[in-house]
Amino acid sequence: VEAIASGADLVAQSTHKSVGSLTQTSWLLGQGDKINQRRITQMHQMLQSTSPNYIFLASLDMARHQLATEGKALISRTVELSLYLRHELNKISGITTMEYIDIQERVVNYDCTKVLIDAKALGLTGIEFERMLREYRIEVELVQAHHVLVLITIGDTKESVTSLIQAVQAISDTILHTSKVANSNVVENAENLSKDSSLLPKPIVRVTPRNAMYANREQVPLRDALHRIAGETIAYYPPGIPCVAVGEEISSSVLQYIENRKALGYVPNGADDMSLETIWVLPVSYTHLR
């Protein structure tokens, strides 16, 4: 069910992921009388470049035209490929995909073109599964404790979907043949780490982002950063939301979140030290600000 058809006022659609426009492009769709178009335009003008990229705009228009003239056939074929992929993956030992029946009591519907592949029964964490798929030249959309998400789009073909099926089959065969299925405790631990770090308390802002950005900083071991003021913003994807932003106090919850993510194999965005053995903080004098 389309968001607009469901009555949404504003919808951001990432056309570059599923429709075929160039990377970085998307649409903001709106309907109804609740939208202040003048306000939206004002905000848009504040954020956008004064020199828009007309190649990007042209790609959006081409994507729009393609949907208008071929959309029904393209989407139907994409859905068929997605269902075929799900059917074939569920035949593979140690592999399952999340289906509507698994979540129907909690949702109105689901997008079958977003295929969540679970490798828990093979003893793989999501990060390990992602790395193994990369050896077959397959990139996934995102990873979590023990699964990966792949997107099937109008650009996919029977050949590309078959390549994914064959890669997953090969990974399953390799693990089961060599009896390298990890101890169930490993995956269970990954699940627990993911759950434990899913929610963080409301951050405490000690210094405004602007003042913090221009303040002197020092680099300290992560273990010594408790209650210090962050001098850099740290985020993991997923969810793509900072666990601590510049100017915020680094709490014990944040430190635990970072340690959990490190244990799962995630690489942070925004960190100067990608290993996060160290972190930039403001001088101790800022710590006493209340």
Language model region names:
Residues 73-149, 154, 176-203:
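Conserved small-domain helix->loop->beta segment predominantly found in fold-type I
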Residues 132-135, 141-285:
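PLP-dependent enzyme catalytic core of the Aspartate aminotransferase-like
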Residues 287-290:
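Conserved small/polar residues in nucleotide/adenosyl-binding loops
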Residues 37-41, 59-68, 108-113, 142-148, ...:
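Short acidic (Asp/Glu) and glycine-rich catalytic loops that position anionic groups and cofactors
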Residues 1-94, 98-99, 119:
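Conserved PLP-enzyme active-site core in the AAT-like
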Residues 17-18, 33-35, 62, 120-122, ...:
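Short, glycine-/Ser/Thr-/acidic-enriched flexible segments
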Residues 6, 21, 35-38, 51, ...:
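Conserved active-site and cofactor/substrate-binding residues in soluble primary-metabolism enzymes
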